[in-house]
Amino acid sequence: MTEESEETVLYIEHRYVCSECNQLYGSLEEVLMHQNSHVPQQHFELVGVADPGVTVATDTASGTGLYQTLVQESQYQCLECGQLLMSPSQLLEHQELHLKMMAPQEAVPAEPPPKAPPLSSSTIHYECVDCKALFASQELWLNHRQTHLRATPTKAPAPVVLGSPVVLGPPVGQARVAVEHSYRKAEEGGEGATVPSAAATTTEVVTEVELLLYKCSECSQLFQLPADFLEHQATHFPAPVPESQEPALQQEVQASSPAEVPVSQPDPLPASDHSYELRNGEAIGRDRRGRRARRNNSGEAGGAATQELFCSACDQLFLSPHQLQQHLRSHREGVFKCPLCSRVFPSPSSLDQHLGDHSSESHFLCVDCGLAFGTEALLLAHRRAHTPNPLHSCPCGKTFVNLTKFLYHRRTHGVGGVPLPTTPVPPEEPVIGFPEPAPAETGEPEAPEPPVSEETSAGPAAPGTYRCLLCSREFGKALQLTRHQRFVHRLERRHKCSICGKMFKKKSHVRNHLRTHTGERPFPCPDCSKPFNSPANLARHRLTHTGERPYRCGDCGKAFTQSSTLRQHRLVHAQHFPYRCQECGVRFHRPYRLLMHRYHHTGEYPYKCRECPRSFLLRRLLEVHQLVVHAGRQPHRCPSCGAAFPSSLRLREHRCAAAAAQAPRRFECGTCGKKVGSAARLQAHEAAHAAAGPGEVLAKEPPAPRAPRATRAPVASPAALGGTATASPAPARRRGLECSECKKLFSTETSLQVHRRIHTGERPYPCPDCGKAFRQSTHLKDHRRLHTGERPFACEVCGKAFAISMRLAEHRRIHTGERPYSCPDCGKSYRSFSNLWKHRKTHQQQHQAAVRQQLAEAEAAVGLAVMETAVEALPLVEAIEIYPLAEAEGVQISG
């Protein structure tokens, strides 16, 4: 009978994706059990299992009943065919099926095939390979198969004795998965196939059921275990075998019998099909350990050893002539190398298939965010990220669609999934002399961590169960508890880089890390063609093209492209600075900022110049120093005016008038309509609106700053001039940051800090040329242009250049005729504030003379008036005290 490959129809909506192999699963239990395959597990062997109530097949060659079975969590495995079942009742029903298949059947006339029942997404259907009929149970399918066997008298049915069990890998499809299992028979009469004799036909027919999950992309061969799949793929590439594995391979080849030849390969099936294969003939196991055990039990090791198959070009050992021929073809035809990731392939078709992965050909687009996916299942899993109720939510506020990412994130929290405190974790490799982070000064005693014990759990564990002390979950076996604690509550760095020895949590992290050693960047950006070494870095880079910032601060509304940047930003709002300098007491919320700060105390910077004794804090400053001072080059040039600068920082500080005139002012304030040239200026302008309050409007021109108290123009009060003092309402104070000295308000913390230097006299920015100090760094930059002779601000009308932008603004008023500064006394206007200040000094002198004259007249008239003046010459009379005797003369008293 020829073999007909049947496709498996899936009715499951996959919701869970494995982060290691990107395989999809439909339930939580499946993905948890599958992820155990990526973790080193302990295997147990059940030797000599015998149950009088169950018919167990024995090995006819050795007469022994030794079976090896892998113990799975909460599963029951049939010792005859290796199938995994979910409950004891299902195991009993399954074993009854084997008993019915082994019972002899009487010849009954063939019946017409029954009508196939309708498909259902909640049951498992069994399909007949002859008439394509579907059945809802194994009993119906078995009875129907007997009708086909009775209709063919030339091939009478014979009792079936199942071969030795196959050690299955991690289960992918369970008994309750809504999948149609399609059965198929291997081709009979193939090359090397054992043809049973007439006597053997009436006694035994050895049948084996295998679950094939892994498909080779080169030759479409199917495999059951990942170890066999990887071993097979190594035969397609010319790679030497390590010395440690060569004796084991030679022993396995010698133990094999020359009569054992692989059966012809079946028709290739899609890699995603969960299909079973029935083979007639000698049972051929896919697992090397099971195959070696069966050979030892059957006595095949004593047979004649097969000839060792070595490659004459690279001395590589192979298990079969077919594998050797495939390997020799790679030597004859050569290999094909990928130009993007340097992988080699034995054929052009496999290379083209691999290049399709780099081209990111995705046909399923998300209508919300525009991301593309290769399969519809991935798109459906992504679409849940846009729904208001994600599948997995963490108490810290994060939500996840992928279960694996949620489990990895949950391990970053403390015991029981409680979020850790916001104190940043110090680096893994401590810096020499680096202090420990100081505890937060909150004024409250730090609560001790409660001890984890059985008394703090929900209650005593039930007899015969094992309880987890961290989450109070109970298990029936100690092995399950151990695996639960290792997989859920502890994140071990089990994967090591073979080059630098660094440990990682996942294999994918190791693969991405290895590209840092090799320099590979196989993931180019489709927008700017910039390559990256991992898909995560590419996805993070693409946010710069789309402008998307998914992580937003709930306090100030500022958005970020990475969650780590948002966490660091939240420390600013929390005023939590755990890293404190031991010398000056300054605190920082990042450890590297404290490390940089400590260099200022020592005076020795880490990067020293080899040609001169100067040292620098940053490497780029050292490179600029060597390039400019020792090499005499100025590589950074302004594209508008052609001015050359030694560093990119100087070029950014260079305010080119030509570029400023050409640059459009695209940022407009939504409150007053003012346009500015950058987003930073717009943000500062809107902050000024917020500090002013909702009812006030900012002036187009900044108001003239108030004169210092010592030089303020003395305006005679009505009381001093003999008039009547009228109470004027105090102006409403605007909201903002207030100076504790003069009660002046500011919109930003930076402006307040700069203003406080006026009261403290601090000038932290000295000029390295003349030693003059300034309160602001911008004042120092403007001052240094006097030494360098640089005049970057040129007038576009007459071409006159200035070193300070304020001087250019004053000069432009000559051409425009604008005079924005007017005197409040006489109404005369001026182009600059300095000219107005000089003019107001004339009014101050007139006011001072008038006040002195009035005081002299009052003193002469009364004779008892005493004028108190300050020690310093003040422009305004601050106090005029007139003794009570002056009231009789009708003089107004002010005090």
UniProtKB/Swiss-Prot annotation:
Q: Where does it localize?
A: Nucleus
Please give the residue positions where the record annotates the modification Asymmetric dimethylarginine: 831
Where in the sequence does UniProt note compositional bias of the Polar residues kind?
A: 247-257
Q: Which GO terms describe its molecular function?
A: DNA binding; zinc ion binding
Stated role: May be involved in transcriptional regulation.
Where on the chain is Phosphoserine found, per UniProt? Answer: 164, 298, 717, 728
What are the residue ranges of zinc fingers typed C2H2-type? Answer: 16-38, 76-98, 126-148, 214-236, 309-331, 336-358, 364-386, 392-413, 466-489, 495-517, 523-545, 551-573, 579-601, 607-630, 636-659, 667-689, 737-759, 765-787, 793-815, 821-843
List compositional bias (Basic and acidic residues) regions by residue number. Answer: 274-287
Q: What is its main location?
A: nucleus
Keywords attached to this entry: DNA-binding, Metal-binding, Methylation, Nucleus, Phosphoprotein, Repeat, Transcription, Transcription regulation, Zinc, Zinc-finger
Q: Give the residues annotated as coiled coil.
A: none
This protein's name: Zinc finger protein 574
Q: Which residues carry this modification: Phosphothreonine?
A: 724
Similarity comment text for this entry: Belongs to the krueppel C2H2-type zinc-finger protein family.
One GO cellular-component annotation of the UniProt record comes to: nucleus
Q: Give the species this sequence originates from.
A: Pongo abelii
Pfam families per the UniProt record, alphabetical: zf-C2H2 (PF00096), zf-C2H2_6 (PF13912), zf-met (PF12874)
